[in-house]
Amino acid sequence: MKKLFIIAIILMVTNRMLAQTGPDYQLHLQLVDESSVFESPDYYTWGGSPIKGNDGLYHLYYSRWEKKYGFMAWVTHSEIAHAVSKSPLGPYVFHDVVFPRRGKQYWDGMNTHNPTVHFFNGKYYLYYTGNTGDDNNVVGQLNFSHRNNQRLGVAVADSPYGPWKRFDKPVIDVSADSTAPDALMMANPSITQMKDGRYLMIYKGVAKKNPGIFGGPVVHLCAIAKSPLGPFKKILKPIFIVKDSPFPAEDPYIWLQGKYYYAIVKDFHGAFTHHGLSLALFYSKNGIDWKPVNNCLLTVPEIHWKNGKVTKLKFLERPQLLIEHGKPTALFLAAHELEDSTNMGKANTFNVHIALK
């Protein structure tokens, strides 16, 4: 009888553990403290990627650009900066600019954006989107010279403080084949080390098939390399797709946990979550074929504070995770305030850091 009881307990615990993986995996967002916000009065702040450094402190790499240029200047005047905190959720304090402009002649010489930081084999790797262009900024308009020159980059350092070694070529460039799904531009890299030791990257690609300067379709693609520095072999099979929805997803963040790969993805219209603009959770057995988890809604664009207030937002996106001891402990997001007649074109942005359970 005692043996049967022990077996029953083991089965119950095992089933509970299994229910938290694969298609049943869940992340639970906790209430947010006011100190878990990072912003600047003079800069748009966007998309923070955290990591615990070898100094015991927490390091945040994020995009910023001066507000005087307008929000759409993310594509012309963004730079990647670095902030530091004693606590994983903050408060973070600005430390330095990681990638200042270095000239039009470089593929990433005019703009760096949307960083994601990782620690592989004793070194820090900072992946990002870079571009060059005509340097012509018109407030409220997207500069397509810069937008369509976006490529994927990586820099490497021995310390979270740098110095960072940048490269004269992208880590992944657009495909030479004009019919390829990433023939026009690429952006927003996300990377994880695979079960076999290789490196899986997922990125946004834009094709040249659609007429007009915007191009399209916009899709997400995989690439795999033996080294964090590449070369990456592309798998030109679109993922996170929905029939009759030309651009359903953006900003995936991927990681390996246990025997599954997971991704947090911005769901533009609720094609996956059925809750409109939201963040959705996906899983994969091999990192290439992806499906939404059961109950895939992670959050809608709003923040629930510890003081009981709820802030509704225009955007809540660019998910990045703090992963410690192999498990996600905090979710970092870029937030854009709602706009109305009083702040049209001038709404604030900030990064918010949310504990996970």
Regions found by a protein language model. Name each.
Residues 19-357:
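Carbohydrate-active catalytic/glycan-binding domains of CAZyme proteins
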